[in-house]
């Protein structure tokens, strides 16, 4: 049945092509879908000084930098009043790092450095010895080394030239692990935590483990967790047991979702997104969407075969307004094809999708990014 026109906005759809075409779900390894509870990174932080700056460090107005310099010199046997510190080649910084799971003493990790005062640039600076503590207050690593900055800040006579953010940088391999996190596999119940909780995925994961290692090995506790019970013969080989599970392939499921970024104009439609029949009035353009069945016949005496296809047509004309019904479309892609011919703004596209969802005609979650 031919479609009737529907008013839609005049906008520029820079990315209607970004709408995903539904496709069969692909299986993924368990290690891409879940993590072992307790096996995770830990955040480290510390306060330090960066020296060797070419006059781009903190000014004397930053009192904590003066106090830090005086305190550091005091530990070296040099006594000085913090008020007398006038060094512009020093900057107070906050140092952060990520402690990988199972990191042993001596392991090198990267650290991030960010200025806390009014330093203009950390380029060319050297991070002095900085203890890095965890949330429990214990020191797990010590950082030190040259700071690498992906930017610059130069100026003279009131003119200034800046690129990126020169007040933050990194020290590659700049920290040595001094203490390992107290955790051992097998001491606590083994649980896999899904990165994207889903009842179907959790059930499929447990079924795949039981099919491979025997019934009762895995049990889906909730959408986010699968509890593992190693067989008696594998209790002393927890690492091998988990490694075998990590390589299993599971077809992950997820809720249908449309993600829209109004700022960049990016639109991504996940698998399973569908539209119901809906009437929309927005702006002063009419969009006609029509999908006709078609048959592709091979040439006489050819080696091909007859296949079923669809012929999509979309047209747009300016109208004075009015509301008419849009026939059911198979997916968001059909709506995108119609809008793609118009040239419509991402802001109006977001409004259309939100209105369709509010009307109950979008069988998916709509997530609008800032």
Swiss-Prot record:
Question: What are the GO MF terms of this UniProt record?
Answer: structural molecule activity
User: Has keyword Plastid?
Assistant: no
UniProt keyword annotations, A-Z: Bacterial flagellum, Periplasm, Signal
> Superkingdom of this entry's organism?
Bacteria
* Similarity remark: Belongs to the FlgI family.
Predominant place of localization: periplasm
The answer, when asked if Membrane is one of the entry's keywords, is no
Its GO biological process annotations read: bacterial-type flagellum-dependent cell motility
Q: What does this protein do?
A: Assembles around the rod to form the L-ring and probably protects the motor/basal body from shearing forces during rotation.
Q: Which GO terms describe its cellular component?
A: bacterial-type flagellum basal body, distal rod, P ring; outer membrane-bounded periplasmic space
Species this chain originates from: Anaeromyxobacter sp. (strain K)
Summarize the subunit comment.
The basal body constitutes a major portion of the flagellar organelle and consists of four rings (L,P,S, and M) mounted on a central rod.
Q: Which residues form a coiled coil?
A: none
Signal sequence residues: 1-27
HAMAP family in the cross-refs: FlgI
Q: What is this protein called?
A: Flagellar P-ring protein
Pfam families given in the database record: FlgI
Q: Where in the cell is it found?
A: Periplasm; Bacterial flagellum basal body
Q: What would be the name of the gene that encodes this protein?
A: flgI
